[in-house]
């Protein structure tokens, strides 16, 4: 219940006291119900209230009825204004939602639009020349307009990586082979040195034995 509706009820109660008649809440609600009845026009309302009050008091109720109609008209006007405001706000909210949805759809479309087509003619020429120079199979750009490598270039990169990897493996294999060869050469040299030492030791042993034999022969002669 609005503030003005409460004030109207208070006015009815006060007026009934002035009429020196029943001012109970039941009577107040009854009169308030008549004045609020949207199915009746103002004349019908005045007639109904006047007839009711005539059964309760002999005092003239014309001014009272007119004042109630004026106050009730203000209540109706306030409600209509409030409803119009609600409808206006609702319409604005709906328009805002539609606008936001439309803008969102536009943003999505712009997001997936190829930036290449937004370039100037000169920018397109430069881009095409770049694509041709580096042998791209197809032109493609991301959302920022940067070139995305085609499958051909990706494959070439993979092949280059494989070649580099293969070269690395070959270099490792050569290094290992060289190390093994160096070990074999070292072992061979060490073996030759050992053979030479053994040979020299054997020759020395033979010389010593020959020397001993010679000494023995000399002793026998003596």
From Swiss-Prot:
Regions annotated as coiled coil: 80-111, 168-222
UniProt-annotated stretches for the region Disordered: 102-126, 159-222
Record field: compositional bias (Basic and acidic residues): 112-126, 175-212
Alphabetical UniProt keywords: Coiled coil
Keyword Signal among UniProt keywords: no
Domain of life: Eukaryota
Pfam families in UniProt: PWI
Compositional bias per record (Basic residues), positions renumbered to this chain: 213-222
InterPro entries linked: CCDC43, PWI_dom
Record family assignment: Belongs to the CCDC43 family.
Protein name: Coiled-coil domain-containing protein 43 homolog
Source organism per UniProt: Dictyostelium discoideum (Social amoeba)
């Amino acid at each position: 219940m609005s503030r003005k509706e409460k004030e109207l009820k208070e006015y009815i109660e006060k007026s009934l006291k002035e009429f020196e008649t029943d001012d109970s809440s039941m009577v107040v609600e009854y009169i308030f119900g008549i004045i609020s009845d949207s199915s009746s026009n103002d004349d019908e309302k005045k007639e109904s209230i006047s007839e009711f009050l005539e059964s309760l008091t002999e005092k003239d109720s014309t001014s009272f009825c007119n004042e109630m109609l004026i106050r009730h008209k203000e209540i109706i006007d306030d409600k209509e204004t409030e409803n119009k405001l609600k409808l206006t706000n609702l319409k604005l909210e709906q328009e805002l939602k539609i606008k936001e949805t439309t803008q969102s759809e536009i943003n999505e479309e712009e997001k997936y639009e190829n930036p290449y087509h937004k370039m100037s003619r000169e920018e397109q020429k430069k881009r095409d020349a770049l694509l041709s120079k580096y042998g791209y199979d197809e032109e493609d750009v991301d959302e920022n307009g940067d070139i995305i490598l085609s499958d051909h270039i990706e494959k070439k990169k993979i092949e280059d990586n494989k070649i580099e990897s293969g070269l690395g493996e070959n270099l490792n294999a050569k290094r290992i082979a060289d190390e093994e060869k160096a070990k074999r050469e070292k072992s061979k040299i060490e073996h030759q040195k050992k053979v030479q030492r053994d040979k020299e030791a054997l020759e020395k042993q033979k010389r010593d034995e020959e020397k001993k034999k010679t000494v023995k022969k000399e002793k026998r002669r003596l």
